[in-house]
Amino acid sequence: MKSVAEKNQNRKLMSAQAGIESPLHIIDCGLAEYREVLQLQHQLREKRRRGEIPDTVLIVEHSPVITLGARQSANKLLASREDLAQKHIDVVDIRRGGGTTAHNPGQLVFYPILNLRQLNPCLPAGKVGISEYIRELESIGVELLEQLGVHAERQKGYPGLWVTNHQAPNEESSNAQNVTNKNNELNSSSVQPQRHTICDIRHTSKIASIGVRVSKFITYHGMAINIQNDLSIFEFITPCGLDGVEMTSALKETGKRCSISQVKEGLSQLLIRHFS
């Protein structure tokens, strides 16, 4: 079986496929095991640090896996590792920001390996702009989900993207008119992806997760967006250590399946625009 690195030797860069000349290299890893892609990230991170490669982004779907981040208090498994292994779900401890999350086919993950000093040359030494970088990832996710008909929002203090939960049409409520007005506001703003709303976590479902790490100004790890994956994998964890959080996907929100290859193409265009 070929490794991810060997597969990618013969895989064209997505920016080239789109006919775009860009200093950003975007590599489609297809469906790949998490541990293999993690090893590839480490290799590319060192090459980027030495200046041997340009800024690079890996786009991938993972086989079922649960990852635990560096924030131990946010790492909450609701099943034993033995039980998860029987269900063919790998569990990996990694050194990235955030807590527990899950990946599986139908979820689109992208890992930017970027030199933050070159991405933001005006920043003084020692100030790598991690907060600005995370906001940029969130902006990319918002714009991608807008293309799929999903209005995603930021939540201050909770990295990632969230979708507001609306009441069902037949549910009686004294504030039904307010909900209708809120829906109209969201619909009217959905064509303006540059306006990224801050939402209330108590009335939202999470659709995208972010966990990053920066070493010697080089980024790795990244963002996972639920497109049309099986959300039942999240029943085995407390996502990001937040009790009561519900997960959602573009499929759950719209009821429509999409072409993952087309979503990857749209993501590639956004990455080039934001990071080139």
Which stretches of residues belong to each language-model region?
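Short beta-strand or tight-loop elements
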Residues: K87, S205-I210
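N-terminal lobe of the biotin/lipoate ligase/transferase fold
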Residues: K2-R202, R257-C258
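C-terminal accessory segment of soluble enzyme catalytic cores
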Residues: E6, I207, R213, I218-Y220, ...
